[in-house]
Amino acid sequence: MRALLFLALVGAAVAFPVDDDDKIVGGYTCRENSVPYQVSLNSGYHFCGGSLINDQWVVSAAHCYKSRIQVRLGEHNINVLEGNEQFVNSAKIIKHPNFNSRTLNNDIMLIKLASPVTLNARVATVALPSSCAPAGTQCLISGWGNTLSFGVNNPDLLQCLDAPLLPQADCEASYPGKITNNMICVGFLEGGKDSCQGDSGGPVVCNGQLQGIVSWGYGCALKDNPGVYTKVCNYVDWIQNTIAAN
């Protein structure tokens, strides 16, 4: 889903040519099972991503909320049964109590699985942050979202993108008045590489720790409009307390 805030001048979209590499946007096909914490949220179709943080809990974006979700793990090609998948239904879905669907502040959600998953080489957890990552840190973004800035091409194979954490000043300048201290920007101010619709809820992993959740942006891969992500390091206590209480 990545909450898409449409450009006012959609008709002028052709004035922004972007070099589409036919991936996440501008990314590459991940090596199979190289992102074992990546999950697909399914309600008869893939609609969002998420990250496995222990054998019974997944973290995603609150704007991905549905009352019933099947979590699919161990996936590479989401349209083919490859034999390594685990499909588990949700038992509890818990949005952050202060999630604001208008501003997308606190865009984080926890999903308790109906039963623990089997951890192996293809299904593994990602660590929560021990501290907030500084600007310039290189991160990996992944998902099965749209691979085009203009038009739609939803890939079968998991897509990856290497991108840096941007300075908060650049993030705020890109989206004046819209960036809270619970949001970070990751990507490229020049455009061309970004997450997109369908990547929502998925991971931004930096040095082995989950630092971001795909949240929103103006369009995808547009100049001066980098992707905006939930700042996971602000929520470690909430995550741990919520899991302990449930």
UniProtKB/Swiss-Prot annotation:
Its cofactor is Ca(2+). It is found in: Secreted, Extracellular space. One of its GO terms (biological process) is proteolysis. The active site is at 63 (charge relay system), 107 (charge relay system), 200 (charge relay system). Expressed in the pancreas, lung and kidney. It catalyses: Preferential cleavage: Arg-|-Xaa, Lys-|-Xaa. Activated by autocatalytic cleavage. Cleavage by CTRC inhibits autoactivation. Serine protease capable of autoactivation. Belongs to the peptidase S1 family. This is Trypsin-4. It comes from Mus musculus.
